[in-house]
Amino acid sequence: MNDTPENPHVPVGEKLQKVLARLGVGSRRDVEVWIAEGRVNVNGSVASLGQRVDSHDAITVDGHLIRREEAAESVRRVLIYNKPEGEVCTRDDPEGRPTIFDRLPRLRTGRWINVGRLDINTTGLLLFTTDGELANRLMHPSYEMDREYAVRVRGEVTEEMIERLLNGVMLEDGPAKFSDIQQAPGGEGFNHWYHCVVMEGRNREVRRLWESQGLVVSRLKRVRFGPVFLTSELTMGRYREMDQREIDILSEEVGLKPVALPGMTTKAREKAERQQRKQARPLARSERPEAGRKRAPRREDGENAARRAPASRPARGPQPSAERKGREQGTPVAERPRESNRKPRPSKPRDERPASAPGDKPAARKPQVKRRPKPAGDGMRPGFRR
């Protein structure tokens, strides 16, 4: 019988920042900043970075007790949002500009965590989740989640420029490159559309790469994040919530186990259906963000009727450099998924008239005959018969 006591140096419990991230209090990076600022307490004492806690420890953030029982009931939720131009990626803007959180559904517990950022002039795909660990893994460079953008550049683009952007150029914060560049249809004159892929989410990286070649980016839109595509069914300024299958695929990409979703009550299902119909319509002119305009009122929750599952790909995770050598080139521009729910545009009726010759005179227009309105009182009045 071995009477040797257990090793006292074996760590007990789980790291504090990981616990709070999993409960959806914030991303792991956010929690680490809060701990460094002294905003997190454990059992009444200021917490330290890397401190381990168990289920019996009382955790407070800014004086508010984190109720783990209520937080444990929350599930992993993910939103796909089509960000319009003019919205800033912050929760509270001191200038009163619209933010990306204004139109998201309100949560009873936890909060929405944005996966990465887009600058105010960039549109397109943004992901939100209630799982801080999922958000942290999706943003971490070690998981190599590729981002694809549609970009319109102004200026003459040469093959030498494309080669330099693929091989890598030196920016202010270090070397950067595209893993793939494909020319897209559209554009006139010196305006050209391209689809390009980057393997990290550095600040304004796509714009700075094109500008390093003396080109001007006139439009920029993110169209894909890892396996998640932005389809035309999700209109600008709208969002939809991923279903269980989509969340499982996205979670497997970063090595997380699936989390089961609870059944919806009848009242919750009816509310979701109402908001689903509401989210299906495009934004009204008064709802669109504009420069210098004050923040729009918060929209209630809802989801788009159309759902699109992300394409399944091999699972990703932190890999040693030796195993990553074969993927140094990154990923190419992905093939767009078929939008089966999209209705075909009605074809315009062809004009059967013969084409006009250069010397022909324009056809004479028929005179417009103005009809006189009926005289007042002409007709059946309520409550009377003729």
Swiss-Prot record:
<dbReference type="InterPro" id="IPR050343">
    <property type="entry name" value="RsuA_PseudoU_synthase"/>
</dbReference>
<keyword id="KW-0694">RNA-binding</keyword>
<dbReference type="Pfam" id="PF00849">
    <property type="entry name" value="PseudoU_synth_2"/>
</dbReference>
<dbReference type="GO" id="GO:0160139">
    <property type="term" value="F:23S rRNA pseudouridine(2605) synthase activity"/>
</dbReference>
<dbReference type="Pfam" id="PF01479">
    <property type="entry name" value="S4"/>
</dbReference>
<feature type="compositionally biased region" description="Basic and acidic residues">
    <location>
        <begin position="267"/>
        <end position="276"/>
    </location>
</feature>
<feature type="compositionally biased region" description="Basic and acidic residues">
    <location>
        <begin position="284"/>
        <end position="306"/>
    </location>
</feature>
<feature type="domain" description="S4 RNA-binding">
    <location>
        <begin position="14"/>
        <end position="75"/>
    </location>
</feature>
<comment type="function">
    <text>Responsible for synthesis of pseudouridine from uracil-2605 in 23S ribosomal RNA.</text>
</comment>
<keyword id="KW-0413">Isomerase</keyword>
<comment type="similarity">
    <text>Belongs to the pseudouridine synthase RsuA family.</text>
</comment>
<feature type="active site" description="Nucleophile">
    <location>
        <position position="119"/>
    </location>
</feature>
<keyword id="KW-0698">rRNA processing</keyword>
<dbReference type="InterPro" id="IPR020103">
    <property type="entry name" value="PsdUridine_synth_cat_dom_sf"/>
</dbReference>
<dbReference type="InterPro" id="IPR006145">
    <property type="entry name" value="PsdUridine_synth_RsuA/RluA"/>
</dbReference>
<dbReference type="InterPro" id="IPR020094">
    <property type="entry name" value="TruA/RsuA/RluB/E/F_N"/>
</dbReference>
<feature type="compositionally biased region" description="Basic and acidic residues">
    <location>
        <begin position="335"/>
        <end position="354"/>
    </location>
</feature>
<feature type="compositionally biased region" description="Low complexity">
    <location>
        <begin position="307"/>
        <end position="321"/>
    </location>
</feature>
<dbReference type="InterPro" id="IPR000748">
    <property type="entry name" value="PsdUridine_synth_RsuA/RluB/E/F"/>
</dbReference>
<dbReference type="InterPro" id="IPR042092">
    <property type="entry name" value="PsdUridine_s_RsuA/RluB/E/F_cat"/>
</dbReference>
<dbReference type="GO" id="GO:0003723">
    <property type="term" value="F:RNA binding"/>
</dbReference>
<dbReference type="InterPro" id="IPR036986">
    <property type="entry name" value="S4_RNA-bd_sf"/>
</dbReference>
<protein>
    <recommendedName>
        <fullName>Ribosomal large subunit pseudouridine synthase B</fullName>
        <ecNumber>5.4.99.22</ecNumber>
    </recommendedName>
</protein>
<dbReference type="GO" id="GO:0000455">
    <property type="term" value="P:enzyme-directed rRNA pseudouridine synthesis"/>
</dbReference>
<feature type="region of interest" description="Disordered">
    <location>
        <begin position="260"/>
        <end position="386"/>
    </location>
</feature>
<dbReference type="InterPro" id="IPR002942">
    <property type="entry name" value="S4_RNA-bd"/>
</dbReference>
<dbReference type="InterPro" id="IPR018496">
    <property type="entry name" value="PsdUridine_synth_RsuA/RluB_CS"/>
</dbReference>
